[in-house]
Amino acid sequence: MRYNTQESQPQTSICKVVGFFDFQQLWRKKEGLKPKQIIEQVRMLHGVHINYKQAWRVREEAQILVRGTPEDSYYNLSRWLYKITETNPGSLTYQHVDAAGKFKYAFVAFGPSIRGFSLMRRVIAVDGTFLKGKFNGTLLAACAQDGNYHLYPLAFAVVDAENGASWKWFFRGLSQKIPDASDLVFVSDRANSISSALEDVYPLSHHGICRIHLLRNITPTYAKTGLLPLVESAADAYTCHEFWLIFKDIKDKCPELAKYLEESDFRKWARSYAPANRYNIMTTNIAESLNSMLKMPRELPIISLLETIRLTMTTWFFERREAAAKHKHLVTPKVVQKLVSRLGAAMLLNVYQVDRSEFEVKDETMKFVVDLEKRHCTCNVFDIDKIPCIHAIAAAKHIKRDENRFVDASHLTETWAKAYAESIHPGGELSTSTYPENIDELSCPPPATKKKSGRPPTKRKRSVGEFGVPGSKSQSHKCSRCGTGGHNKITCQRPIG
């Protein structure tokens, strides 16, 4: 009997036998081996020559051994959700089916994370990203930022698509743990589905739009005006006076752009006009960075995807808890860096004390009023960032006070440690656990999907304004006729005059 030739056994048998060896690799490496690596490994270890298609099937077989089939993952989802709530008290999970009883939505918010949010600045960035597995779908995420400016995940949902109904369902779940309030801020892209859902579920909260998405929207029409840096500066301005100095310049140079920005509502994109404090969170980067981190897990069955998120959060909570315990400074490491970077400029200012807590601080051209007790400066940086500006630092140094004492409680090391004080626990092995009878009654089949023609996408389409690294495949290209992006000289319809 021959054991070392491809003809000695059927294709499927090769996949099952060799899949065991890749199975071992998958335990040590999240993404497993690439098909080309599998071809080489099988040739070297077993003397069997397989082609790329067979190697791909080997990889799929190995992933099934590790993670189960995508179909089984949906059937077992109710068990996984139950175990998470059992091992992590205060967690919230939901599962929703369609009219045919098939999976439609799933929601997860871990109790330790939700409780930790009560110690943080009340700004939540939300974003969605498509899933790349057999049944497609979309992952919705809500994230905050901790006192050390780290990403802090709050809630997730797997839904059929990113639309008004799914966002409303997601926000309804989130509102069970984070109620509506006037000091709560959501930051997102300009999708109408998010806006309408927030208006319905969180009417008291403020909805701000991401500065980067605003710039992407105006790039196709106004990039050649050279005013995009001014728009960015206007969005980031701390005072209305500073905002209007910049906006007047925009209006004088391009009235059409100024009109568009006015119609976009200053309160949504300009920090100085926001009715609730956005602090430093002017973009959805914290949510998008999470989606980027989950690039590979988005291909996995639903339980493996959610388990990857859980494991990531478990690791983050442990590592950051340890880091906070070792950090001996009053304020978090990133805030220490900010204050140190401002110290040099602060020492060049002239300070005049008005009373016990009020000071007049002057530079070469302007003067500012600082009230250390009220944690206020007329530059508004102290008020919004909740960290002493250069003027407040100068005032504190003038009376020999430690500027760290005037940092907001959300940035204290003690608060940072409390946010990660609890652990996020694994749910345990599903096959050996016991469950209440009603849990298996909630089991549902996977969603019905319509397979699209052609190869399924693994990358989202980039919007205008997302430029690649020079020399890379993702680099943007400009029309050789008119010099703008988005088309080539063959399809160019711009008048040249």
Locate predicted features:
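Active-site beta-loop-alpha junctions of metal-dependent nucleic acid enzymes
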Residues: R2-V18, K30, K134-F135, F156-P179
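Basic, short loop/linker segments at the boundary and entry of helix-turn-helix/winged-helix-like folds
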Residues: M1-G32, P456-T458, S463-V464, V469-K473
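Hydrophobic, aromatic-enriched, well-ordered structural segments
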Residues: N51, I64-D72, N76-F117, S175, ...
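Cysteine-centered loop/knuckle micro-motif
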Residues: A55, C389, K489-R494
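Short conserved beta-strand segments at catalytic cores or DNA/RNA-binding microdomains
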Residues: G116, K134, T138-H150
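Two-metal-ion RNase H-like nuclease active-site motif
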Residues: V108-P112, M120-L131
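Short, basic interhelical loop/turn and adjoining N-cap
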Residues: R43-K53
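Short Cys/His-rich zinc-binding micro-motifs
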Residues: H376-D383, H477-H487
